[in-house]
Amino acid sequence: GVPIKVHNEDVGSIILERINPIPFSAENQDSLIFFGKILGSAIFWLKEYDKLYQDATHDGLSQLLNHQTFKERFQEEILRAERFQHFITVIMFDLDKFKRINDTLGHPYGDYVIQTVSNILKENVRAIDLVSRYGGEEFVVILINTSAENARPVGERIVKTIAEYPFDYDS
């Protein structure tokens, strides 16, 4: 077998077995080593692409979809809802008096609030739903295949969870 390395760090291995007892030739082994290096390089570039994609499509602070990606995905979901004849519901959240939080408690605390609210939103919707940071302290949730009647308890639960959260922050 040969290791698969990314920057001299083992990330996997390739192991080959033969049914017959004939050993692999030196040329076979060299080819396998070369393949392991190519595979390691491919894994490295795939990880780099994933980082670039994440940076391009997600808000850096909240790790939610960014505004542009939200608009693109929203259009896709509208078309999907029309095609499959199902509902989508959009819920918009705005943090009241957020400027006052930044002005009185500082921007690090404001960042903590944004990150905490982002986590609350993600934890209170399904994996198929979309959550986005729409603007400074504005968030949008798209509930897929969900009527307004069924979305209301979700929105109320999120508002209640945010309102009751202690927001303890140690700088």
Where do the PLM segments sit?
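A short, aliphatic-rich beta-strand micro-motif
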Residues: 1-5
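Amphipathic alpha-helical "output/dimerization" segments
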Residues: 6, 23-44
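Short beta-strand-to-loop transition segments that serve as allosteric relay/switch motifs
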Residues: 7, 12-23
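Short regulatory alpha-helical coupling segments
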Residues: 53, 67-86, 118-126, 144
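Alpha-helical scaffold within the catalytic cores of cyclic-nucleotide enzymes
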Residues: 118-119, 150-167
